[in-house]
Amino acid sequence: MQIPFTKMHGLGNNYVYIDLFDYAIDEKLYHDLAIQISDVYTGIGSDGMILIHPTTDADVGMRIFNKDGSEGKSCGNGLRCTAKYAYENGIVTNKKFHIQTKANIVEAEVSVDNNKVNQVTIDMGEPILARNEIPMMGNNDVKVVNEPFVVAGETQYITAVSMGNPHGVFFVDDIEKAPLETLGPTIEKDMRFPESINVEFIEVVSPTELNFRVWERGSGITQACGTGACAAVVAATLNEKVTKSHPIVVHLAGGDLNIEWKEDNHVWMTGPAEVIATGLFYYKEE
């Protein structure tokens, strides 16, 4: 089966995008297709696969699959790339429109120069802070803010935030010494998180800047995570390390995102989206 694709990235967080507006794929193949297409040796190579599809509830829909084939609910970098693709390929004609994910419907606004999208701003919605809605085991409706968290025999301190997908945020003094490769996979699969969790280590540079590294659920270390950057700013605000309603620059491995948690409780994200390649993927149905 020959499948047209576009590979895109948001600050290095790269996915293979498949346009289902003019092309149909049997849903039972999504899991295996995501695994095959994401393989760096025998596929295109990516952090996962995103399907751009019609929906009656918004201007465009997107479904996110990690490189292990599991389906995610939201992806900030994926939203920006989907917005760019939708505008540049005529799926939408207005610069402000709505995208549906498994988590929610978000508003996107594109900044255009010479008919090319160079920046995308997304209203990522309201953060979810109740423990049972992260979800995380324990006292149901209590916020998880700087809570002791024993892992690998050591006590870390976690702040948990959901931005449509779950994030465990840990603050460190030096981002270069963050135990991402060792604790990332351990925390991701910890039994205290029924749906597993994304893991972020954050260094506070100043009241307006954060350094950020991420271990993504189902994908491992990636260059960037948009929902994670939003969760990091919410967590930093809850821990009184930054101020609400002030733009915060989050320095990710792949570049910078501008995040603001506004007084209306919505978190806004602004950043770039880029096309890497287009082509045909030769899918072997197993």
From Swiss-Prot:
Positions annotated as active site in the UniProt record: C75, C225
The protein here is known as Diaminopimelate epimerase
Xref: PROSITE patterns: DAP_EPIMERASE
Please list the GO terms describing molecular function. Answer: diaminopimelate epimerase activity
Query: What does the record give as EC number?
Result: 5.1.1.7
List the source organism: Oceanobacillus iheyensis (strain DSM 14371 / CIP 107618 / JCM 11309 / KCTC 3954 / HTE831)
Quote the pathway field: Amino-acid biosynthesis; L-lysine biosynthesis via DAP pathway; DL-2,6-diaminopimelate from LL-2,6-diaminopimelate: step 1/1
Binding sites annotated in the UniProt record for substrate? N13, N66, G76, N77, N165, N198, E216, R217, G226, T227
- Identify its protein family: Belongs to the diaminopimelate epimerase family.
A single GO cellular-component term on record: cytosol
Q: Report the domain of life of the source organism.
A: Bacteria
Site feature: Could be important to modulate the pK values of the two catalytic cysteine residues: H167, E216
Name where it's found. Answer: Cytoplasm
The record ties this protein, via InterPro entries, to: DAP_epimerase_AS, DAP_epimerase_DapF
